Amino acid sequence: MNDNLNVIVGNNECGKSTLLEAVHLALSGQLNGRPLVVEMHPYLFNLDLVRKYIDSLAAGEKPHPPHILLEVYLADDPNLTKLKGDHNSLKIDRPGVSLSIELNPSHAEDFIQYVSDPAEIRTVPIEYYRIVWRNFAGNDIAHSRDIPLHASLIDASTLKNNAAASRYVVDIVKESLSAQEKVDLALTYRLMKDRFLEQPKVKTINDALALKKGKISEKTISVSLDTSARASWEAGVMPHLDDIPLTLVGKGEQNAVKIKLAMETSAKSHIILIEEAENHLSYASLNELIGHISANAGTRQIFITTHSSFVLNKLGVESVLLFQRGSGVRLSDLANTSTQDYFMKLPGHDTLRLILAKRSILVEGPSDELIVQRGYQKKHGKMPLEDGVDVISVNSLAFKRFLEIAVLLKTETDVVTDNDGSVAGLLAKYANYLTSDVVKIRYDTDETAKTLEPQLVKKNGLTTINAVLGKTFTDEASAIEYMVKNKADVALRFFETTVDWSVPDYIADAIR
């Protein structure tokens, strides 16, 4: 990871949030704001692995019980010496922390009895499990204070109701107060409650209630404000923005304030983990927030998850960890340094599209994009993006740069390209990808139909071309000449027409 800023980019369900939660859990011992011991449940375990375990039991095998292991490897810093050792899965001498959820040996016999009938098992019986929290020196960790660094997890979007949002901000404000300020605020709040009883109208009400003594109770009844410990100032104080309760301002403003406050009061934190800072924010507001995060990062290590190409551009592609299918890679992992430089300079939108797509189709320009989009819709009854397939228009000179990322991410990618009158040249250009399991080069071998337009004429014939374009060309050559000179308009006509037409075979292969 980078020492300062790390932007984690990936599709939904790829594990971005899990990564942040795992780091925070290993360093704090807390999940969802509470100790792990009270937040343990069977669904913390990977469902596929649990199913595999149950299937193995059903097959008569004796697999090792499912377990969870989190390891956080830290920099070899003198301040972390007491965490240093080789008690980790890599067996390297480094500072670090491990947290495991594993079968408790004292319950091993009960566990074996429980799993003796695999047909009755659906989830992991966590009642037989224990939590083991240790540093790499092999010493048990009793409390997060035993770890000389602190992590703050900021996910304002999880606060769905007003009460939770208010408590969240009050807790942050409380952290920023000195001990004396907390005492002063608590005392002032109690005095304010005491003055409630001095109000004339309250006295009148209590005098009337006192007359009911003996009718309802033998004791005198009165009304007052709760001054018990449960009614502390934290429960009664509501944060305001310009005299409006925080819970009543816009969601975007709420989230921005929560993130900023958390960063301000996390000055002692060494690691800050921010979940999707862009939630509910406009372009301008997001710009201001990202600027604030960058300016206030200091020497702290920051992790931000995002789907936003703007965040990618603002914070820099060099900070990005491309996360997919539970693993992450960086652009610095690319073997070709010129490709690294290219994507460092390129606006992040197209890069993000390639990262987030389940499958991508790279085309040479807007005309090809329209034809591929419409061809896909005609075949599947919906647009490519509805299937997680992104059609990306790329300068032909940049094709191979995008393919390097596709191979790095193992993202299935089709290249729809012209043969430009030289199949041999095309094969030489993509020689490294012709046998790839990830990348497929789609082209036509007919060198006389070297671009999209003659390919459309070749596939559909002059009659269909005239019907689509609303023209009366008498020969294919004049039709092709017109189509080449009016690429965008022609592609749009093909996209919008109700006339039945077919895509060239090499495009059909890509929209399978």
State where each predicted segment sits.
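Conserved P-loop NTP-binding catalytic core
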Residues: 22-91
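Conserved catalytic network of the ASCE P-loop NTPase/AAA+ motor domain
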Residues: 61-65, 89-92, 124, 263-267, ...
